[in-house]
Amino acid sequence: MNPVHILAKKGEVAERVLVVGDPGRARLLSTLLQNPKLTNENRGFLVYTGKYNGETVSIATHGIGGPSIAIVLEELAMLGANVFIRYGTTGALVPYINLGEYIIVTGASYNQGGLFYQYLRDNACVASTPDFELTNKLVTSFSKRNLKYYVGNVFSSDAFYAEDEEFVKKWSSRGNIAVEMECATLFTLSKVKGWKSATVLVVSDNLAKGGIWITKEELEKSVMDGAKAVLDTLTS
């Protein structure tokens, strides 16, 4: 089957891909590549391919939420990709994590049903965890660059505006330190499809502190600093 949304050709997408939700972020991070080439812009799913540390990598846009990232991952895999690092933003659920810091994700909680039921074809739950080797490399890369990070589980939500005080208490009490929208899909599909995947998140807001948000300038700096560590990992 050929991709329907990502209209790149085989050979125009690398085996190793940094995936982000925001097309603007994909455009920004492409400046870190040598000779980046825009290989897809259909549907706003920007994909760039270039060199970093002498290795070919791609930066691709996955949009918002589980169904969107599932489509993009499936189509990138059709084009030859099999290693994915999601690099996104997250809302902290615990007060000790500061804005602009990083979370290297070790697992994702999620609600049953929907996309997961359709892929798994029953109500069984797959452990939604990243590739250990890739995650360990991320820890090493972030440590080498002296970037402040936490390692822990997140909750993958399907409803951005359903996050209130009760939500924070519920999911933090279950061992989750942050909330985002795509990790569970990424990790579960990777298990089912035989891909390798991992995730790093930049803390853009803290729900445990009343929903305070990072400034645009501070977020961009943290994103660019962390992206170098992510690309170091992809090319090591």
From Swiss-Prot:
An MF annotation (GO) of this entry: S-methyl-5-thioadenosine phosphorylase activity
Residues reported to bind phosphate: 21, 25, 43, 86-89
Cellular component annotations (GO), alphabetically ordered: cytosol
Residues the record lists as binding a purine D-ribonucleoside: 5, 163, 180-182, 204-205
Protein keywords: Disulfide bond, Glycosyltransferase, Transferase
A family per Pfam: PNP_UDP_1
PROSITE patterns linked: PNP_UDP_1 (PS01232)
Xref: InterPro entries: Nucleoside_phosphorylase_CS, Nucleoside_phosphorylase_d, Nucleoside_phosphorylase_sf
Function comment: Cleavage of guanosine or inosine to respective bases and sugar-1-phosphate molecules. Cleaves inosine, guanosine, and adenosine with a better efficiency than MTA.
Protein name: Purine nucleoside phosphorylase
Source organism per UniProt: Saccharolobus solfataricus (strain ATCC 35092 / DSM 1617 / JCM 11322 / P2)
Phylogenetic lineage: Archaea, Thermoproteota, Thermoprotei, Sulfolobales, Sulfolobaceae
